[in-house]
Amino acid sequence: MPTVTFLPGFRKTELPSGSTILQAAQQAGIHMNVVCGGLGKCGKCTVYVKSGRYDFDREKYGKFFTPEELEAGACLACQTSVLGDVRVLIPEESIVQEQKILIDVMGTTTELNPAVWKYALRLSPPSLDDPSPDLTRLLWGIEKSGGPNEGDIYAPLEVIRRIPRVLRESGWRVTATVVLVPGGYRLVDIERGDTTPACYGAAVDLGTTTIVVFIRNLIDGSIMGVASNYNRQISCGEDILSRVTFARKGGLKKLQALAAESINAAITEAANNAGIDRDHIYEVVVAGNTIMTHILMGIDPAYMIEEPYVPVVRRYLTAAASRAGLEVGENSGLFIFPAVSDFIGGDIIADILASGMAEQEDISLLIDIGTNFEVVLGNRDWMFACAGAAGPALEGGEVLFGMRANAGAIEQISLDLETFTPAYRTIQHTKPKGICGSGLIDLLAELLRACIIDRTGRINTAIEHERIRSGRQVPEFVVAWKGETGIGKDIVITENDVKALIMSKASILAACRTLMKQAGITHAEIARIYFSGAFGNYISKENAITIGLIPEVPVERIFPIGNGAIEGANLVLLNRRKKRFLDEIARKIAYIELNAEPSFMDEYTGSCFLPHTDLSLFPTVEEMLEKCRLRRGVP
Amino acid sequence: MTISTLSDWTGEVGTVTIGATKADGGTRSGTVTIGGERDLAFIGNPPTGNRPLIAYELCDDPSLWPAPVIRFLGDRASDPAEWARFAAGEYRPDLIRLYLTSTRKRGFSAFAAITTTVENILQATGLPLIIEGSNDPELDSEVFRRIGEAGEGERLLIGTAEAGRYRSIAASAMAFGHLVIAQSPIDINLAKQLNILLREIGLPHDRIVIDPYTGALGYGFEYSYSVMERIRTAALKGDDDLAMPMISSAIDSLTVKEVREADPSASDRTSVAWELYAMLPATVAGASIVCVRHPSTIQPLKAAIEALWSPPGGGA
Amino acid sequence: MALKALDIYKLLPKKNCKECGEPTCLTFAMKLASGKVKPEDCPYLDENVREILGASTRPPVQRVKLGVGERSFAVGDEIVQFRHEKTFFHEPGIMTAVSDLMDPDSIQAVVADVRDHLLVRIGLDLRLNGIAVWSASGSPDAFATAVEAVEAVAELPEVLMAEDPAVQEAGLAVCGNYRPLIHAATGDQYREMCALAVKHGCPLAIRAPDLDALAGLSGLCTAEGVSHLVLDLTSPSLHDMLNQATAVRQQAITRTAPALGYPVFLDTRPCGLPDAALICGVLKYGSVLVADPLSEASRKALLVLRQNIYTDPQKPIQITPGIYRVGSPGPDAPVLLTVNFSLTYFTLQGYLEASGTDSFMLIVDTEGLSVLTSVAAGKLSETLVRDSLKEFAVPDLVKHRTLIIPGYAAPLSGKIEDETGWKVLVGPRDAADIAEFLEKEWT
Ligand code: SF4
Ligand code: FES
């Protein structure tokens, strides 16, 4: 059997001659882009065959490549059969990133300024000539090694109790760990021997449904381990309000414990993967929504959900991690991101930090999309923020065949504008089971381009086509026939689905426009749009604009920042100087209550149209749609 | 006089001509043109555009019609042609608006009667006509085809297209050369959206009259009033998708509590007041056609519109 | 012109010191832009900036108060040309005219009628406002007698319509302490009239042949120390009244002719179309409207129109949540859920009444938002429905467990069923179709 070797990782796999490179890749566990499902139509599965015998019809598929690319051995993986051992280079564009929960290896660079220092000390034992006490001896040692002045370090009792033994048992060779907390330097640990390389911190995104943990090496900033896991509070209520209700009914203790437990589990998993000891985690930085962080700290969130909606704490919080029940080093610090209001929490401050918008003079718009959405508009001088409910449609909820971004979800789709034949890609390339958020956005845009739906989302049943049918209650469009799906029935999108999606996208666009109006900013003045949230990385920017989910700006101004909350937490963990900046960000933000903003409803109905009732706000979309209509002719 | 209204508008409401005379291929004794304003309603010396018109509303099945009108008319209400002849002759509205209320009864299938009714009305009066068809998607295509066909060449204004059902009516208008009323529920965005939808299926703007939906006085009229003002100012600011003339009819005026419960001796006067106090404001907000059902409202409404229209010395 | 929050922010000291009571200068700027705070609240503004901000946030139409006591009213303080831009703040006062040629008894009958006439709608009292006493005879004594007749019956705000200063003075001698509106100063006698206005502390109406002259006269009167002016734009031509009132409002709010920044007075009698003139006065910027006594039908319609037009478009009128009965519903009657936006309530109620089906309306508290809005804003939720069913003891009222919800609330139907255990029927989107719906679905 021929062996296929994939570059650049040298992953190898064997399979029968005549198999396609795509099959080889799948067998090797490499997820390639197969937008058209391996039909040779989308050109997304490009690979370069570097050596070996293979068969590929250059005539037929040449149109996807430039001569230079062909020269370099470009092929379509799905249309290339392997005839002998081959070496194949898979360019990055052809690889699908791992789906599941979004874990992003941060793009932002920051100075490494952690709040933790470890000092390996060789102390001289006391003598009659040098009778200074153990603690002083230790602190002197730290000072001499370049650490803070002896008098500036606070040593908690638990650590002091261990000093005499550790010093003597180790033969006066110890490692002392000092952490900078708001109150000053704190001696948090003393260990035998030299453990300086084992200096870690944890960054945590405490979400309502998921928890993500990064363990970072605080000496070089490298990522040691990553883990994610469901928030175990889900057993007490699916959404945030039901959690608060649960807390109100005396369940706060339980919720607090579950939050800690969920974080501990993720930390343990990440630590185990990295082969490190949890006790060497000296600082934990948590970004989460206001209610989640209140619960983690055991603060009653009840008053936040009733008028006038005030949180108990707005500024950042610190404490010993053990007091929140986190199982890391005994005296390790815990840092909680500040919040603006009950709706704009530390997760959004983390988004802002991660985006860098608070340092720029240009105006940015940051959008965090989930069942609830948050929008922030501003620059380094001022910021407006608002939050609202978008409904679950964009996450696949309340849509007949909608689903979360799990295996089998159609996450990318295009339609042949003549034949209406879809070409799609599913997560993990299994047979389709449903459609997730990014797929739904694509689908909406494509249905509009193909003039199958009008701008209010109504399916034009006057078109005679097998994929357009009246459905049980409302008209629907068949995305995948029963035979090709993994669920044994046709996957369709109904007119009601389309409307639910339009309503969801409308609340987000309306929120953006309300902030822009409040600030007197036009689309042209927005230098960047940052996209955060579960599907931020996979979403098609063009299609998001086509349907009017976000304001039209040139696509190169749009930046998905993935999970901004975890990125922000990482940044703070690695660079303590950002902490003060967080409070500054939080203070700068003026929160706008959309429900109290009379123009919001107007913006909303204006946005319940594809892309928007004011067509002049979406000039290039209009041009494109005009062409589509002309091509189809007026029905 | 140097201080006057500030008219720095850049847009203009489009004009729409309803009805066709013999010369245009129809049988109407005259046509009417609405729209053309370049300023707020009645503003300017003389005002811009065309004077607002009054349409008198009647129907082919009076069982769904307001009681005060039926009481006032007696037997005449049972024959739409006779009704139209009487109203046009005695009260002189500018247009007649016929509602084919018979199509709104359950199980309606008398499609042939639609053709006859429309033809009869066309014979009964020489005024330009507005015809309101069914409001059931199941019936629409047949009903509007019939209306379109029966009135071919007459340049009827037919209603009512909504965002949920606009294709059949637009198709009929395009096939038989008529005009369309585009109705949306008291919202400027929805009004604009419908106009865009109609444009995109090929119905040009000069064949559309906007009906922003009018709530009765005391029952949401203020929303309609403001939406009309907004639509008008949007048009004057240059929004082409809203630059069509508007029609306003507070169809619930004569069924509201105040009118229903009025002392029988004051029934007519209350009916007139409730129609007048909604329809005159509608013209001030920018409506080009206002509609009434009580014949006695026509005269005072007309006098008021004329007084608002004519600059002094311009004759009344 | 109104400044945007960000424009204002740029002028602020950006100290974020919180001394104004706001968390940040930006929030202060937002509130200032919407008129919720005053520039003076920030102690760190320099004179210049305060001036700019003050000028752009002060209402461009002077506030003027008529009468004293319970029935007194204020007009002016308006800031927009169209009500949808914000709202119209002060309803015009409707002043019923009596003349000094009428005998005191007839005058008193009119006054008593104005005093007692009351229309209650949506929980609000709608009333006519006062009396305009018209000097038809030209005699100071007759005028004083007429004013006395009015005063004898009620403490209502008055307009004293007499251009002869001597006659005016006779009237003021009777009621000058009660802040009547003096009508009217003209180019010929404005000095005397101003003196009277100053002496009695009364607002003054002014009249001139055209707007330029009126602006000039307004300047002269303020120079005489009268700042509470009202501009009389009465004309026999309805067209002219509308055009002039529009011009005055435009000039005032754009601050192009500050001398016209006063409320408008319209006498509806000369044009011969009282209904039409009153309608125009209510719609287009009249603040004090004089009219002969009206028929009950016109009067009602007028009061309702005025209420409609002066409703804050941004604050929908709400209905108290609860159970409302249509007809006399029994334990088998349908229960229809809707929101407490008054328009929705009245529309549904109207159609239900017309349908003749006895039924219960369950009105839930969506803070006055319409169905569509409250669904979008998450105000109408399954928990709200559940709590409302319980709060208003609906299970005790009916035997069945079926709830009819508005068509636009369809997305919530499943959740409501889960949360309440009631079966949910999705009703029509348009209340007009409710009769047909009930006929089909409720048998
Ligand atoms: S008082 Fe002035 S400077 Fe201080 S926060 Fe308020 S607006 Fe800013
Ligand atoms: S071309 Fe290979 S997967 Fe589309």
Which sequence ranges carry the predicted segments?
Chain B
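N-terminal amphipathic alpha-helix/helix-capping segment at the start of soluble metabolic enzymes
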Residues: M1-G74
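Active-site mouth loops of central-metabolism enzymes
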Residues: I3, L53-E82, R106-A110, P137, ...
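Structural preference for beta-strand elements that scaffold enzyme active sites
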Residues: R51-E57, D94-R97, P128-I130, R155-L157, ...
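Glycine-rich, proline-tolerant flexible connector loops at the mouths of alpha/beta enzymes
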Residues: S63-F72, P93-T125, I131-E138, P300-L301
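Catalytic domains of carbohydrate-active enzymes, especially glycoside hydrolases
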Residues: S78-T101
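Catalytic beta/alpha-barrel core
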Residues: Y99, F108, P128-L139, G153-Y166, ...
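Alpha-helix-loop-beta-strand connector modules within alpha/beta enzyme cores
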Residues: G107-E132, R145-G153, E229-M244, A307-A316
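Catalytic alpha/beta core domains of metabolic enzymes, predominantly
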Residues: G164-I305
